[in-house]
């Protein structure tokens, strides 16, 4: 089975991604990373930074998670991200997404020893 840490990497890490050169980035990546199976995942964020940089967030600023849990951490620096959001006209199985690129601080939930990201909580 896929671990929470591996699922996080599949759903959120694209260190070498260059969405700026590809208008179909979200449509292609959401399929490639298996987020359009059974339904179209409504929203997903990809992070274009080295995995080590994202894993390091687990030792940065401790903040409350959206669900009230206390194991979330906010990155000190802003990171290159791409938000993929399903379009209103999108109909499964033909999932269609619009993309927004940004530089934002990320908030992730971390678990384990060593502590690694297992859930993408928010961007600020």
UniProtKB/Swiss-Prot annotation:
Pancreas. One of its GO terms (molecular function) is nucleic acid binding. It holds the Pfam family RnaseA. The active site is at 12 (proton acceptor), 119 (proton donor). Its EC number is 4.6.1.18. Monomer. Interacts with and forms tight 1:1 complexes with RNH1. Dimerization of two such complexes may occur. Interaction with RNH1 inhibits this protein. This is Ribonuclease pancreatic.
